[in-house]
Amino acid sequence: MKQVTISEVRAYVMAPGEMGADYHNQTGTHWIIDLPIANPMSVYEEYKAKRTSWGINALGTVLVEVELNDGTVGIGCSIGGEPACYIIEKHLSRFVEGQDPRNVELIWDQMWRATLPYGRKGLAVQAISAVDLAIWDCLGKLRGEPVYALLGGATKQKLPVYATTSRPDIASEWGFKGAKIPCRYGPADGDEGLKKNIAVMAEAREQVGPDFPLRLDCYMALTVPYAIKLAKALAQFELEWIEECLPPDDYDGYAELKRALTGICLVTTGEHEYTRYGFRELIARKCADILQPDINWVGGLTEARRIVAMASAYDLPVIPHGSSVFSYHLQYAFTNCPIAEFLVMSPAADRVVPLFGELFRNEPLPQDGYIELTDAPGWGVELNDKLELLRPFETMQREGVIS
């Protein structure tokens, strides 16, 4: 491979009304916004009706381009919007520009260590993720290989996928390998809400028949007692797993939940966990049967591959959160990634559409319940050049002064 260096890092947000990596940033009606879905803010009446009421989509997408001195451009994305752009352009760029892109481990470690005073989780790691993914895209393009080949090659010819959706009946007809539906009500809704949750799952099971796997996404909304009570009530419908019931830092709660639900259903979590250190806690405390890191948030591919490798030593499956082309490459390359998630992002959950909206060209979509990746170099997707992107800190000097 020819000798190259990284010449520039550019961080963008999307124009108003564009979705990108933030799937909550919808215009018009949409099931993920308009249905009652339990969430951490459901305990407050004024924020119960919609997740967007409390600003879940306030920051939006960050899109990163990493350009090499030979003109190669790699792309990566996450959430975090303008604040993430600021971190990338003002702070992280100094550890990236001028580097050999093959030094991805060194670059990641320097970004991680430099953000420890204000980072460790959340926004800073999301910013690191976007940069890291863009570097891996560059590496694939330089070598003329897909990213999964850089990780050791494909362990499967195609990747089975399940649907996250409000319409499990349609997902079943499409050939998906199961469906995950949102938990509608939480502890603040009392026994009446519990009865409604049971009714929703009963209807789903009736629609799809006895053999189609069903899962429940609880989005950090429950308590340990409520989650145990709910899971036991749903056992009659052969619930396969209950997902992210508790706030991500409640490791003791997850361990208690897993012990209580052994033999009833699987416990999964990790969507809002960050870095291998967070997942080490989940593993060491026996918090989950399945781990669910999000490659666009957890630290990018460099960190996600460490997490998957660590999980394999404990015979733990990893089923990443989100239907991201980036995570598909990770899952292609590891044997302990048995199935992928696909978010059905059409407004009525009745069409298969790209997760990232119009952001990318050639985003892979499932057919008959499987994703098949090509041998296109890098991530195999290209930025849609007709989409309006805004670079909020383009004029920022690298020494930290905005001109």
Region roles according to the model:
Residues 2-21, 25-49, 323-403:
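Flexible C-terminal active-site loop/helix
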Residues 39-69:
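Active-site-flanking structural segment that lines cofactor/substrate pockets
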Residues 44, 232, 238, 249-370, ...:
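Shared catalytic-loop signature of beta/alpha-barrel
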Residues 50-52, 67-142:
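Metal- or metallocofactor-binding catalytic centers and their adjacent structured scaffolds
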Residues 76, 161-164, 177-181, 214-218, ...:
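Hydrophobic faces of well-ordered beta-strands that scaffold small-molecule active sites
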Residues 123-126, 132-168:
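Glycine-rich, aromatic-flanked loop segments that form ligand/cofactor-binding clefts
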Residues 152-257:
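Metal-dependent enolase-superfamily TIM-barrel catalytic cores that perform enediolate-based chemistry
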